[in-house]
Amino acid sequence: MAKELVVYFSVYGTAKIVAEEIAKQTGADIAEIEPVVPYDSNRDHYNALARLAKKEHDEDQRPLIKNEIDIAAYDRIYIGYPMWWYTFPMILYTFFDKYDFSGKIIIPFNTHMGSGDGGTYDTIRKLEPKATVLTGLPVEMLDAENGPAKAVEKWLKSLH
């Protein structure tokens, strides 16, 4: 049986909610991508976070990751993130640059406020051509906050 890991990056906690649900339903291990410099998780400061995210994207920054994640020990890796400026946060580029996904199965999921996956699943396929990238799960932010169990269950069944 394939060893599974759910890896996620989340500032406001919505991607974390989905990640925890996936781990619960699959029995996968779970790990958070933690930035060296934490992002402000106060939703009242959303505009400041949005400006920072845009600046990172425009300047092609690669925020550093604080923790190590043992990707090599896993065959199937669920990777989750919020959408920022219609793409994934730049720390995900750091993550894909840092680890070798050759021969792995990547299963993306994301939270959003109306942009779906924004083409990020195709971006992952381009960044990781030696991995197999399966159909992802875009979850609208309010659906994540209200409980994604049914959507996750349906999606997981579609993968098998």
Region roles according to the model:
Residues N110-S115, M141:
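Short beta-alpha junction loops
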Residues E32-E34, N110, L137-P138:
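Residue-level recognition of beta-strand->loop/alpha-helix junctions
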Residues G114-L127:
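Glycine-rich, charge-decorated loop segments at or immediately adjacent to ligand/cofactor-binding or catalytic sites
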Residues I71-A72, D97-G103, K126-P129:
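Short, conserved loop/helix-junction motifs that constitute active-site signature segments
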Residues T132-H160:
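Glycine-rich phosphate/pyrophosphate-binding loop and the adjoining helix
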Residues K3-E4, A31, G119-Y121, L134:
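Extracytoplasmic/periplasmic soluble domains downstream of a signal peptide or transmembrane helix
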